[in-house]
Amino acid sequence: MMTLTLAELAKITGGELHGDETVCVSRVAPMDKAGEGDVTFLSNPKYAVHLAECKATVVMLKAEQRKHCSGHVLVVDDPYVAFAKVAQALDTTPKPADGIAPSAVIASDAILGQNVSIGANAVIETGVSLGDNVVIGAGCFIGKNATIGQNTKLWANVTIYHQVQIGADCLIQAGTVIGSDGFGYANDRGEWIKIPQLGSVRIGNRVEIGACTTIDRGALDDTIIEDNVVLDNQLQIAHNVHIGYGTVMPGGTIVAGSTTIGKYCAIGGASVINGHITIADGVNITGMGMVMRSIEEKGVYSSGIPLQTNKQWRKTAARVHRIEEMNKRLKAVEKIVEQKKED
């Protein structure tokens, strides 16, 4: 079991320690469930009243909350960020694979870096290049001439199509498909003619992709995911989409083809983004947003209807359907008022 001393926690987080620097922790835990050997954190000041009851060995908090805690403490600028760093250091998640399984099928000309692991029944096709410390989970398929950078991990049954490029330090969860055909068809008098998708997908460094997400290859140019992007489960990223540095997308979002999303955007879950539009840097779209036109300025945008009781929602829906009629009536009243003013 991995253990860290308070002194080591201070080094990891950059925090200021108070207490015995030799005390050890081995787990991260929520404040109300933490006990001996646990490290916890306080990020919301309203929970400070519970510090007196907290049984954690170490608490990470801001300087202004220090007075509420008499035990071993780490004073940090951002307790939630500190928690994330400590959780990484104490992570017990197993590797997707360890060593090269006898049942893995690896092309003779595939290039494997040092310390590569490949799980059972994985297929590595001709021309593939895997960097140092790459981990390929059981049942994965890596297509011809694909490249995967060092320290990247793929969980079970991930499919990487031909010529896809994935950078270093990425994490891809189970069942995701990268590089499948984009939705490209021409209509010839009612008959659909498939357009071969001749581009690929380029994924940068430190990108995380959730389970069962699909990222389509470009029609001619590549679909591009820049560095430090985080994509959740069950997303659909269509062909030739370009997602900028540091953007995050929770689950269920659909991005139609040839759309560009800027840097540091946050796209709420279950959003739908139209194709061939541009979203500026720093845009925050709340959940269930429907984006039909380009967004040219950063800010927070919403379009989903917040939850109501069914009775309230039915009234709202009925009024929405009467908006055009109500607008005409309002204009008629305004016209009468203006005429009376003139008289």
UniProtKB/Swiss-Prot annotation:
GO cellular component: membrane
UniProt signal peptide: none
Transmembrane segments: none
Pfam family, one: LpxD
CDD domains: LbH_LpxD
Active-site annotation: H239
Origin: domain of life: Bacteria
Enzyme Commission number: 2.3.1.191
Reactions performed catalytically: a UDP-3-O-[(3R)-3-hydroxyacyl]-alpha-D-glucosamine + a (3R)-hydroxyacyl-[ACP] = a UDP-2-N,3-O-bis[(3R)-3-hydroxyacyl]-alpha-D-glucosamine + holo-[ACP] + H(+)
GO MF, any single term: N-acyltransferase activity
Protein role: Catalyzes the N-acylation of UDP-3-O-acylglucosamine using 3-hydroxyacyl-ACP as the acyl donor. Is involved in the biosynthesis of lipid A, a phosphorylated glycolipid that anchors the lipopolysaccharide to the outer membrane of the cell.
Protein name: UDP-3-O-acylglucosamine N-acyltransferase
Species: Vibrio vulnificus (strain YJ016)
Gene: lpxD
